[in-house]
């Protein structure tokens, strides 16, 4: 029973992202964060192995962006993201791999520094759906 309790505590997703900026938006939807950041997909209907873009609006002066995608439903390693600024929006073109699950949840982790060099981290979740 003790080992079962330890296992359940280790799987608690609430214990992982305490010091980060997250939001309660729905997967695949435009998300607004408390620090005036926004994240959204070029197309809310994501299919594996099909290109799409992730868009960001960040506070003025944001710099040193680093981002990656990781599978939540099934860990499949991580996919680095390269954001490029296009006007007021940061854009990363990417795609996700196919998984044995029909619906796969992905997590984008983004870190950046504010204009006064304060580090910030935000998370954005979305689902890909196997259509074949």
Where are these regions (language model features)?
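C-terminal motif of bacterial Sec signal peptides marking the signal peptidase cleavage site
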Residues: 7-10
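Short, exposed beta-strand-loop hairpins at the edges of beta-sheets
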Residues: 108-123
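Sec-dependent signal peptide recognition
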Residues: 1-3
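A short, hydrophobic secondary-structure junction motif
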Residues: 112, 130-132
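Contiguous segments within soluble domain cores/interaction surfaces
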Residues: 12-101, 105, 124-130
């Amino acid at each position: 029973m003790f080992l079962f309790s330890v296992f359940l505590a280790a799987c608690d997703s609430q214990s992982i992202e305490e010091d980060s900026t997250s939001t309660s938006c729905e997967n695949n939807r435009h998300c607004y964060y408390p620090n005036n950041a926004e994240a959204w997909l070029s197309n809310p209907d994501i299919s594996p192995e099909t290109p799409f873009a992730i868009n960001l609006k960040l506070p003025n002066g944001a710099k040193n962006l680093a981002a990656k995608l990781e599978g939540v439903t099934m860990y499949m390693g991580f996919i680095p993201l390269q954001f490029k600024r296009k006007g007021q929006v940061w854009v990363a073109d990417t795609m996700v791999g196919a998984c044995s699950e029909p619906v796969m949840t992905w997590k984008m982790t983004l870190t950046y520094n504010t204009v006064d060099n304060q580090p910030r981290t935000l998370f954005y979740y979305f689902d890909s759906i196997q259509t074949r």
